[in-house]
């Protein structure tokens, strides 16, 4: 919580107003933010200064792991996070590549699991990483990226948290995740849960110890219609101790994550929080 609250306060104190063309709103913005999550000691970075809905965040990332490209599949997992971008984004609604209701196009997990090569074949970035790590291999390129400029027009949204790099020191696994843009009041709440959980899951299915996860954000911002709630409500609250995340130990392979895992396989204990804050969401 310390890094999160420091970032929120930094944006309020030092941020510069920037017009955002996509949303038509102004954002109070800072450049370069670093957060660290202690996965080894299970310090689950669940926001305590407002109620945080962690299941939706994990469900969304599980959908990425499975390479889903349809908002309906994400809803089945337990999250509606792609409903708006798939069905209410005017640019995507008018895109000839859109296949119909709930179609997201070639975004996020599609790129991670089926990156297209010039010859039409695909690369499964995630499986390569899992296979290497299970065999104790770190080739300094254990990288999964969703950022494919050659196919931006084939999806409803460019990836915000776009690249994940795994590093192995002995039998301890580390993760560094890169994010080009972050809606701090809403998006960061999800993203830090996902970074933590991704490292925890990958360590579990590759038989390694989880170390720390490093989260690097380029453009961190608060939208103008979120600022009052952040300054006068959330930042006035004292944080509670962090909770712990418990993952079903029967999850042992990538195939498990692809097939039978549900939100019932994740539990959070020791979570105390303040009341929810309804921040506006910008499509």
UniProtKB/Swiss-Prot annotation:
It holds the Pfam family Thymidylat_synt. Its EC number is 2.1.1.45. This is Thymidylate synthase. The gene is thyA. It comes from Pasteurella multocida (strain Pm70). It is found in: Cytoplasm. Belongs to the thymidylate synthase family. Bacterial-type ThyA subfamily. Pathway: Pyrimidine metabolism; dTTP biosynthesis. One of its GO terms (biological process) is dTMP biosynthetic process. Catalyzes the reductive methylation of 2'-deoxyuridine-5'-monophosphate (dUMP) to 2'-deoxythymidine-5'-monophosphate (dTMP) while utilizing 5,10-methylenetetrahydrofolate (mTHF) as the methyl donor and reductant in the reaction, yielding dihydrofolate (DHF) as a by-product. This enzymatic reaction provides an intracellular de novo source of dTMP, an essential precursor for DNA biosynthesis.
């Amino acid at each position: 919580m310390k890094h999160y609250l420091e970032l929120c306060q930094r944006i309020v104190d030092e941020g510069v107003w920037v017009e955002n063309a996509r949303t038509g709103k102004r954002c109070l913005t800072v450049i370069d933010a670093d957060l660290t999550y202690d996965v080894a000691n299970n310090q689950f970075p669940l926001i305590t200064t407002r109620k945080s809905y962690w299941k939706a965040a994990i469900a969304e990332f599980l959908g990425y792991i499975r390479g889903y490209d349809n908002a309906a599949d994400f809803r089945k997992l337990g999250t509606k996070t792609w409903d708006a971008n798939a069905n209410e984004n005017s640019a995507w609604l008018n895109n000839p590549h859109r296949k119909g209701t709930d179609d997201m196009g070639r975004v996020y997990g599609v790129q991670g699991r089926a990156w297209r090569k010039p010859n039409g074949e695909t690369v499964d970035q995630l499986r390569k990483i899992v296979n290497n790590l299970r065999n104790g291999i770190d080739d300094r390129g254990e990288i999964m990226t969703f950022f494919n400029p050659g196919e931006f027009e084939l999806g409803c949204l460019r990836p915000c948290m776009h690249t994940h790099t795994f590093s192995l020191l002995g039998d301890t696994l580390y993760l560094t995740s890169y994010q080009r843009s972050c809606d701090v009041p809403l998006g960061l709440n999800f993203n830090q849960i996902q970074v933590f959980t991704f490292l925890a899951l990958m360590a579990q299915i590759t038989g390694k110890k989880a170390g720390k996860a490093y989260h690097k954000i380029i453009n961190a911002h608060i939208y103008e219609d979120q600022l009052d709630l952040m300054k006068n409500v959330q930042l006035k609250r004292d944080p509670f101790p962090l909770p712990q995340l418990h993952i079903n130990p029967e999850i042992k392979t990538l195939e498990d994550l692809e097939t039978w895992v549900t939100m019932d396989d994740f539990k959070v204990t020791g979570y105390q929080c303040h009341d929810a804050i309804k921040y506006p969401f910008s499509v």
